[in-house]
């Protein structure tokens, strides 16, 4: 973890940010070390301890949340009573929301491991790579290539809702027409089929061509028959969008891949885009012609190489991706301890940090900006379309 060198003065920034947070003390690490998520918590604990092995690191106070909001609240209260100056974790959004008010009342900042941007507030930063961050990056990439009319086919789930909300916001920010969004029941293929048919406006598109063919046949002469035959060879008009956001993966994505050609949706008229989850499925996706060329935003895999190597050398196994958050949060804590403490001014310096998954900037309002790369699904493996930025332009948002 390192600071990104700044070429801009930050004096105006520093005067606008409240000096919230403690300057010193041990760092609390709140994780589910018992219950169903204990294996996740134990692995994240190992990742955090790697960062705290650095020379001059503050003491690390590991506490068990028991995998519940109530347990997280109790762990936070105990950590604060013990004099801890910063909280890393907890894992989930509900647990982080339980910890937030307790920490804020005690003048303690929180770096949570959730990826839900909705819980962000001054003093509480969700560090996970959020659906919103992914959508903003990939929709902007599509817009840069001239695709500006968006639509989405999303599961009726919390993840789908977050993707839909992010798409609406990004389309508005780019000055695009409000997107058409269809939600389907993830457990029903019939619901999925209806949603695809509706969003693609297939009935109207196909009906118009069919009506012209029938009218030609109704002429009941040679000219009409020739026209009908010619019209039958014409493609169905394109759908009313040129960018289609999908949130599905696995079997559901494969099902969508069979439906899209049937409803005449695909390249070059339509750019398919999707979530970071596609990074681990890109090669399988490339076996479906409808998905070849699809775009997704994700951290460059090579960036986490040093962390993976360090983790594997110490623990003898490869770390799951979620461990990146624990390592980066811990590294930020160690760096902040050397730079003046765990205050909002230190944590939200607009130069940001360069971590395991690339550049990230914590903002005073609790939002987190990330620099993600954009990849294209190709038969030979994912193709880098737009590299991840090494720094993000200033975008100072005041605390509210």
Locations of regions flagged by a protein language model:
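Extracytosolic ligand-binding ectodomains
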Residues: 1-400
């Amino acid at each position: 973890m390192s600071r990104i060198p700044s070429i801009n003065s930050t004096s105006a920034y520093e005067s606008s940010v409240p000096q919230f947070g403690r300057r010193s003390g041990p760092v609390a690490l709140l994780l589910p070390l018992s219950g169903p998520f204990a294996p996740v918590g134990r692995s994240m604990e190992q990742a955090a301890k790697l960062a705290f092995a650095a020379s001059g690191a503050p003491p690390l106070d590991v506490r068990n949340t028991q995998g519940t909001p109530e347990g997280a609240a109790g762990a936070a209260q105990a950590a604060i009573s013990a004099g801890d100056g910063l909280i890393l974790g907890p894992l989930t959004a509900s647990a982080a929301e339980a910890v937030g008010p307790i920490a804020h009342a005690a003048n303690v900042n929180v770096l949570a491991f959730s990826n839900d941007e909705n819980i962000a507030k001054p003093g509480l930063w969700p560090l996970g790579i959020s659906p919103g961050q992914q959508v903003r990056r990939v929709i902007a990439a599509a817009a840069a290539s001239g695709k500006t009319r968006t639509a989405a086919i999303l599961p009726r789930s919390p993840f789908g809702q977050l993707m839909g909300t992010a798409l609406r916001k990004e389309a508005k920010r780019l000055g695009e027409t409000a997107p058409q969004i269809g939600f389907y029941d993830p457990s029903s293929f019939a619901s999925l089929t209806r949603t695809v048919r509706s969003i693609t406006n297939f009935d109207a598109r196909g009906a118009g061509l069919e009506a012209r063919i029938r009218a030609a046949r109704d002429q009941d002469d040679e000219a009409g028959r020739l026209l009908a035959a010619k019209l039958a060879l014409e493609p169905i008009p394109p759908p009313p969008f040129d960018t289609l956001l999908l949130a599905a993966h696995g079997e559901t994505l494969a099902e969508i891949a069979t439906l899209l050609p049937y409803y005449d949706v695909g390249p070059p008229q339509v750019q398919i885009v999707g979530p970071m989850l596609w990074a681990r499925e890109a090669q399988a996706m490339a076996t479906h012609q409808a998905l070849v060329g699809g775009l997704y935003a994700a951290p460059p895999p090579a960036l986490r190489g040093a962390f993976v190597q360090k983790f594997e050398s110490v623990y003898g196994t490869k770390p799951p991706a979620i461990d990146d958050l624990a390592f980066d949060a811990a590294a930020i804590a160690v760096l902040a301890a050397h730079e003046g403490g765990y205050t909002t001014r230190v944590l939200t310096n607009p130069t940001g940090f360069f971590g395991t998954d690339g550049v990230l900037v914590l903002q005073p309002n609790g939002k987190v900006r990330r620099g993600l790369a954009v990849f294209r699904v190709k038969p030979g493996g994912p193709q880098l379309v737009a590299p991840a930025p090494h720094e993000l332009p200033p975008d100072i948002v005041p605390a509210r």
